[in-house]
Amino acid sequence: MRHSVIAAVLTVASTTSAALTWSLEKSSSPTTDEAEAYGLIEAALEAAVARHARLGDASKTLYVQYVPGVPTAEASYDGTIRFGTDRSYLNERTALHEISHTLGIGQTQAFDDRCAANDWPTATPLLQSWDGADAIINCGGGHIWPYGLNYNDEWSETNADRHVELINAMLADGL
């Protein structure tokens, strides 16, 4: 009996650790602008985190803020994501893109080293299975393409799924 209880606890702990979790910092008395932004940001994060849960196993605690001075959105490896006032960026595409930065895209030495060497033994074959034998992961300016979801015109359900799958493959490669 003791072993089954320990096994159950370990299963819960490992399931919990392999997930993206997030919290949105909110004003206690939000303005109309803040309330609207909070709703859009929450919807974007809920969709992005659900997609990650369905297609990958990335793990990170995300600290999300609405910061009117931010032109679009920005993120750091420490898990902070900041969205600005431009409503065209308060969407799932932007949330997925910024989450990738919190996971290491454009943020770590491992990313820089693997990009410079084009050393993605798991991610490159995955990309090639979609885009053909000549496909490579391009890196520049702290971003990747294809499937980096760098701009709103890159959005599609297929591209969003591939983004999550590619980021998870890059994590498996040591991102």
Which functions belong to the PLM regions below?
Residues R93-G106:
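Active-site recognition of the HExxH zinc-binding catalytic motif
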